[in-house]
Amino acid sequence: MEKNSKLGKKLLATGNGRCNIMNAGEPVYFGERDFAHQVLSYCPPDSVRAFLEGLGLVLRTGEGGRMYPAGNRGDMVLDALTTPLLGSGVQVLLDTQAEKLEQVAEGWRVTASNGESYTAPSLILAGGSCAAPKLGGTDSMYQLLTPLGFELARPLPALCALETQRKPLQGLSGLRLLARLTLLAQGEPADAAQGEMLFGDTGVSGVCAMQLARAAAQALDKGQEVVLSVDVTPTLGLRDTAMERKPPEKPGQMAETARQWLLKRAGFLPDNRLLQGALPKPLADRLQGPSIEETAHHLADWRLQVTGVRGFDHAQVAAGGISTRGINAQTMESALPGLYLCGELLDVDGDTGGHNLMFALATGILAGESAAG
């Protein structure tokens, strides 16, 4: 039963159309992360990969462990998943949404938007989250499950751009650079990431900024003050340039390294042009201070007030969802016999890079095998 007019609409949008299907590196999950790790102990990444290769897919591994179909096309993944489905005679109901769930003597009854009711001994729910409504994201599954006693962790946008005060960004729109970003909530480091960031008119994006949206949304939802500390020393070659999530550290601890770098440049450049040729001019002008000490501080800890995140329309996933309490991580069966939950519907969200699809696949494999008996 598919709400959209075709299968795999969200799948085709992942990885900029290339379908970043899974990740070969260390799993990175949030929310009820212990549950995610339990799931991956029963259906590990190697098993997910074997499942996909058993469908004929050839996978390749890129930067950061990201795995794609060798042809770099999402429709290859969709074809691999749907061909055996349709070939087995499975009836697919498109443009059809579940509107009511009932536990009955025969198992579960679903009343659908087409006016029909369907009854089966087992029911698998993989309705996703409210992220990306243009691709079919909705909160309808939450509304169906909470009356049945399931707990809901408030959904918030994740993996989206950060909105900041606009004045400090004037003249920087479109600028890309390598940076280490640290998110501060009430003055304390909450999360950090390193990689390419992109300046916009209303905030910052890029992978490393998007990775911090979850923590930013949760802190703002609690009414906390949220600040982004931008460290541009990776662009200057003063830090490693690996594009990956980093553990939080004390903001500005690279200031002394930056100061020593500036002192060397002071031997051949005027004090008011120490960043000339090192950073794009609009940013160099913004970070250049009246003294070497102040410029060094700006390079290692330039602060932007975070005012929000872009919202579900622009979010790749949602933080929050249905609690995994009572769900068997080996089978994905809930405390209500015959009812299985999987994927992004649950209070588990992963980092960018294929972690979310890998969790969806692993839970789907476990649920399908268990429900089929």
Model-derived features: positions:
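Short loop/edge segments at beta-strand edges and connector loops
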Residues: V92-T96, R154-L156, R310
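Glycine-rich loop(s) and the adjacent beta-strand/alpha-helix scaffold that form part
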Residues: S122-P168
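A conserved short coil-to-beta-strand element within the FAD-binding core of flavoproteins
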Residues: L94-G107
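Short beta-strand to alpha-helix junction loop
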Residues: A36-P44, E63-T83, L93, A132-G137, ...
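A conserved beta-strand/loop capping segment in the N-terminal third of enzymes
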Residues: L12-L78
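Glycine-rich FAD pyrophosphate-binding loop
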Residues: M1-N16
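Residue-level recognition of phosphate/Mg2+-coordinating polar/acidic sites
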Residues: K6, I21, S41, S47-A50, ...
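A conserved FAD-binding loop/helix module that cradles the flavin
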Residues: S129-L148, E333, D347-G373
